[in-house]
C-alpha cells in the first residue's frame, strides 16, 4: 500500500497570478484573484509525489463566518482532467517528481471576499488535510460571464485599474477639474474595503446571507453607497456643509481617498470628518474599483434636490428677488455621484450598463441613507418605477425651477425655467486628462420628441404634476455676463446684458446684487450691489450695465467653493412684469507649479519642487503644501513654508519622493494658508524601470 501523501508546502504563484489577473499591485504578499478566471498553484509533497489513480485530491474553498454550499460560500471539488468554466474545478497540468502544478477555476458568479483554500489528500482509506492558504476573490471585468464584464480594454484600464483622475467642480459656465488620488491598490486599501463590507449592518445582522449576496455587484454597490456615509452605521465619512470644520478636515482640503480610508480604519471604524458630495463619490469610486467594479465619478451641474418628487424646485422671493422661507429644496451648483458598470438581472432586459449610485446622504432609500444603483438608461427614458431611487435621480437632472416673486401689492408673480437643471454632466475621459460630457446619456435633446415622451412616462408613473407653460414673453431679456480676469484676489466687473426685441420703449428698473454662495446653493454675505437704476430701453436696443466687485469686499467671506452668485432683477412697473437672471461665478485659483528634479526611475529618490505665486494684495500666512500620489509616495506628505509670503512673491517647498511603481503616475498637490484654501495642482510623472 502506498505511503500517505504529505504536503510539504504550497506555492500560490503570486507573481504569475498577479500578472494574469491584473492584481500585481495587490499580490506582493498574498493571493488576489478575479473570479471566473483560472489561476495556478504548485504543490510540493514530501517523499513521493502525487499518483493519479492512487491518490485523491479534494479541495475546499470557503468564505465568511458561516459558509455553506447552499449559500454559495463553500465549495468542495476534486481534481479532474481539465478545469471547467463556470464552476469550482481543478486540474493537474504538469508534474515533476514530487511537485505538481495545478490550474484551478472559480465561478464568474462566486461571492467576492476572503477565502480559505484547503486540501484533503487521501490514499485508500487514509488521508490528511492541509491548509493551502488564503486568497481574496474580486469581480472580473475581463470575464464575459461576470456581471461587471466590460469589453473595452481601454475602459477597463480607466475604470478599474487607474488610480488617479479628476473630479469636476465650479459652475456650468466655468468647469474646474480637480485632481484626485483614488489609490485603490495602495497598501492596506483592499483590506479596508473588505472591512467596510464586514462592518455594514446587513453583515452584522446576518453574516451568512450578506456574504452570499456579495456575488451580486448590485447588492455590493448598494452596501458601499450606504457605508461611505455614516448616517445609519459605522460608515466612513461624516458630511458637513456649514463651513465650520475646525474639529476635522475641510472637505475641500482632501486630495485623495487613501488618507480618508486609512483614518477610518485607524480610528476603529469611526467616522472621518468631513465630507461633501465629491468626497463621498471619490471614496465610493475607490472602494468599488478596488473590488473590481468599473466605476467613474460623475458631476451634474445645477443639480436639483427635490424632496417631494414633484419635479419642481420652488423659490419664493421678495421684491428684490431674494429667496425667502423654506430652503430645503435647492439647486446645487454641482453634485457628484458615481456610475458603476454592471448587468441588472433583477430587472427586465435593457437596463445593463452604467448604474448611478449616490453615497452622499440626502434622502433615505428603503430606510437607509443610500441611493441606487439605478440604470442611467431608466433616467433618460423616464422609467421611474425601476429600482433603485429613479425618481430622485431623475429630478436631479430634470426638475423645473419655479420663481414666485412678491409684488408691491402682496400678490405673487410666477415664472418657470425648464433649462436650468442638469447641465454639462461630466466625467473624466478614457485615457486622457480631459472632460467628457455625458449629458446625452441622462437626457434627450431639449425640445425633442423623445424628451417629451420620456416626460410623459415619468409624469404618468410617478403621478407628477403636469408641466406648466412659461409666462408670456415680453420681448425684454436679460443675461449676466462676465468680464476678464476672474481670478482670486482680483477686482472685476460683471454685466447685466439687457435686450429689447420690440419696436416699443420700455421703462424699467434694475437691481443688481452679488453674494457669496456655497456649492450647495446656500447664500452668504452681499459683496456688491447697486442702487435701484431707472432704465429706458429703446426699441431693438442692447444695454450693458456693469457691477464692480472688489476683493476687499469678497476676500474675507468667500467659501472654499470660490463661488459668487450674481442676481439681476429687471422690473417693468407699467406691465407688472419682471425678468430674473442669475449666474454663478467661479474665481480661478492661482496655478501650482511642479518641477521634478532627478531621473524618474523606480526605487530611486526624486525631488518635487512645488511653488505658488501669491495673487493677493496681502501677505499669505501659515502656508502648507500637501502632496500624495499612488506609486510615488508611501504616505501623504505635508511641508510648511516657514515665513509669510508677500504679495506677488512665491511660496516654494521641496518634497522627497521614492517611486515604487513603473509607469504613468500623478503627483497631486493641495495648498492652504490663511487667505487661500484648497488650491489644487498636479503633475504627470512617468517612472522608468530601475
Swiss-Prot record:
Disulfide bonds join 230-370, 370-371. The keyword Transferase applies. GTP binds at residues 479-486, 583-586. The keyword Transferase applies. There is a cross-link at residue 636 (Isoglutamyl lysine isopeptide (Gln-Lys) (interchain with K-?)). Ca(2+) binds at residues 398, 400, 436, 446, 451, 542. It is found in: Cytoplasm, Cytosol; Nucleus; Chromosome; Secreted, Extracellular space, Extracellular matrix. The active site is at residues 277, 335, 358. Its cofactor is Ca(2+). It catalyses: L-glutaminyl-[protein] + L-lysyl-[protein] = [protein]-L-lysyl-N(6)-5-L-glutamyl-[protein] + NH4(+); L-glutaminyl-[protein] + serotonin = 5-serotonyl-L-glutamyl-[protein] + NH4(+); L-glutaminyl-[protein] + dopamine = 5-dopaminyl-L-glutamyl-[protein] + NH4(+); L-glutaminyl-[protein] + histamine = 5-histaminyl-L-glutamyl-[protein] + NH4(+). GO terms for biological process: cellular response to dopamine; cellular response to serotonin; peptide cross-linking; phospholipase C-activating G protein-coupled receptor signaling pathway; positive regulation of apoptotic process; positive regulation of GTPase activity; positive regulation of small GTPase mediated signal transduction; protein deamination. Transmembrane segments: none annotated. Monomer. Interacts with phospholipase C; promoting alpha-1 adrenergic receptor signaling. Interacts with PLCD1. PANTHER family: PROTEIN-GLUTAMINE GAMMA-GLUTAMYLTRANSFERASE, PROTEIN-GLUTAMINE GAMMA-GLUTAMYLTRANSFERASE 2. This is Protein-glutamine gamma-glutamyltransferase 2. It comes from Cavia cutleri.
Amino acid at each position: 500500500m502506498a505511503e500517505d501523501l504529505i504536503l510539504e508546502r504550497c506555492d500560490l504563484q503570486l507573481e504569475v497570478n498577479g500578472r494574469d489577473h491584473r492584481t500585481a499591485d495587490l499580490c506582493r504578499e498574498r493571493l488576489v484573484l478575479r473570479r471566473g478566471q483560472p489561476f495556478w498553484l504548485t504543490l510540493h509533497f514530501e517523499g513521493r509525489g502525487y499518483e493519479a489513480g492512487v491518490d485523491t485530491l479534494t479541495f475546499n474553498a470557503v468564505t465568511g463566518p458561516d459558509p455553506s454550499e447552499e449559500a454559495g460560500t463553500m465549495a468542495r471539488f476534486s481534481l479532474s482532467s481539465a478545469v471547467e468554466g463556470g464552476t469550482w474545478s481543478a486540474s493537474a497540468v504538469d508534474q515533476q517528481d514530487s511537485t505538481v502544478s495545478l490550474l484551478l477555476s472559480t465561478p464568474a458568479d462566486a461571492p467576492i471576499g476572503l477565502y480559505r483554500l484547503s486540501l484533503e489528500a487521501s490514499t485508500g482509506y487514509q488521508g490528511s488535510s492541509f491548509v493551502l492558504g488564503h486568497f481574496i476573490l474580486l469581480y472580473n471585468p475581463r470575464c464575459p460571464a461576470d456581471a461587471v464584464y466590460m469589453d473595452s480594454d481601454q475602459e477597463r484600464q480607466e475604470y478599474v485599474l487607474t488610480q488617479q483622475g479628476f473630479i469636476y467642480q465650479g459652475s456650468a459656465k466655468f468647469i474646474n477639474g480637480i485632481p484626485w488620488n483614488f489609490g485603490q491598490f495602495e497598501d492596506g486599501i483592499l483590506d479596508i474595503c473588505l472591512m467596510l463590507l464586514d462592518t455594514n449592518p446587513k453583515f452584522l445582522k446576518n453574516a451568512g446571507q450578506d456574504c452570499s449576496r456579495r456575488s451580486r455587484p448590485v447588492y455590493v454597490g448598494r452596501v458601499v453607497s450606504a457605508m461611505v456615509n455614516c448616517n445609519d452605521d459605522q460608515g466612513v465619512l461624516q458630511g458637513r456643509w456649514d463651513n465650520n470644520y475646525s474639529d476635522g478636515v475641510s472637505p475641500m482640503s482632501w486630495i485623495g481617498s487613501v488618507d480618508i480610508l486609512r483614518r477610518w480604519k485607524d480610528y476603529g471604524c469611526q467616522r472621518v470628518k468631513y465630507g461633501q458630495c465629491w468626497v463621498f463619490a471619490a471614496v465610493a469610486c475607490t472602494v468599488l474599483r478596488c473590488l473590481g467594479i468599473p466605476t467613474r465619478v460623475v458631476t451634474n451641474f445645477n443639480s436639483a434636490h427635490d424632496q417631494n418628487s414633484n419635479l419642481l424646485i420652488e423659490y419664493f422671493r421678495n421684491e428684490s428677488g431674494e429667496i425667502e422661507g423654506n430652503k430645503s429644496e435647492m439647486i446645487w451648483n454641482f453634485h457628484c455621484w458615481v456610475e458603476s458598470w454592471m448587468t441588472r438581472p433583477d430587472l427586465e432586459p435593457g437596463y445593463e450598463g452604467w448604474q448611478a449610485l449616490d453615497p452622499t446622504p440626502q434622502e433615505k432609500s428603503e430606510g437607509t441613507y443610500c441611493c441606487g444603483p439605478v440604470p442611467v438608461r431608466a433616467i433618460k427614458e423616464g422609467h421611474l418605477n425601476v429600482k433603485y431611487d429613479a425618481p430622485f435621480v431623475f429630478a436631479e437632472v430634470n426638475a423645473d425651477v419655479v420663481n414666485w416673486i412678491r409684488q408691491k401689492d402682496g400678490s405673487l408673480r410666477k415664472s418657470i425655467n425648464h433649462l436650468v437643471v442638469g447641465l454639462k454632466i461630466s466625467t473624466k475621459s478614457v485615457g486622457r486628462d480631459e472632460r467628457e460630457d455625458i449629458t446625452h446619456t441622462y437626457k434627450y435633446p431639449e425640445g425633442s420628441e423623445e424628451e417629451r415622451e420620456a416626460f410623459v412616462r415619468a409624469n404618468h408613473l410617478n403621478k407628477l404634476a403636469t408641466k406648466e407653460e412659461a409666462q408670456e414673453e415680453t420681448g425684454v431679456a436679460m443675461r449676466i455676463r462676465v468680464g476678464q480676469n476672474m481670478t482670486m484676489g482680483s477686482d472685476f466687473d460683471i454685466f447685466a446684458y439687457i435686450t429689447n426685441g420690440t419696436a416699443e420703449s420700455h421703462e424699467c428698473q434694475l437691481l443688481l446684487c452679488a453674494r457669496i454662495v456655497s456649492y450647495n446653493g446656500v447664500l452668504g454675505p452681499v459683496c456688491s450691489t447697486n442702487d435701484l437704476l431707472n432704465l429706458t430701453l429703446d426699441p431693438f436696443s442692447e444695454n450693458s450695465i456693469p457691477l464692480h466687485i472688489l476683493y476687499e469686499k469678497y476676500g474675507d467671506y468667500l467659501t472654499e467653493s470660490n463661488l459668487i452668485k450674481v442676481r439681476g432683477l429687471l422690473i417693468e412697473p407699467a406691465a407688472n412684469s419682471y425678468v430674473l437672471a442669475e449666474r454663478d461665478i467661479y474665481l480661478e485659483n492661482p496655478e501650482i507649479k511642479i518641477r521634478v528634479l532627478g531621473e524618474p526611475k523606480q526605487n530611486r529618490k526624486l525631488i518635487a519642487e512645488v511653488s505658488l505665486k501669491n495673487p493677493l494684495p496681502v501677505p499669505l500666512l501659515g502656508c502648507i503644501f500637501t502632496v500624495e500620489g499612488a506609486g510615488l509616495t508611501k504616505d501623504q506628505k505635508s511641508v510648511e513654508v516657514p515665513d509669510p509670503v508677500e504679495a506677488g512673491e512665491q511660496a516654494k517647498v521641496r518634497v522627497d519622493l521614492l517611486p515604487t511603481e513603473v509607469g504613468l503616475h500623478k503627483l497631486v498637490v493641495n495648498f492652504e494658508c490663511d487667505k487661500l484654501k484648497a488650491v489644487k495642482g498636479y503633475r504627470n510623472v512617468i517612472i522608468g524601470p530601475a
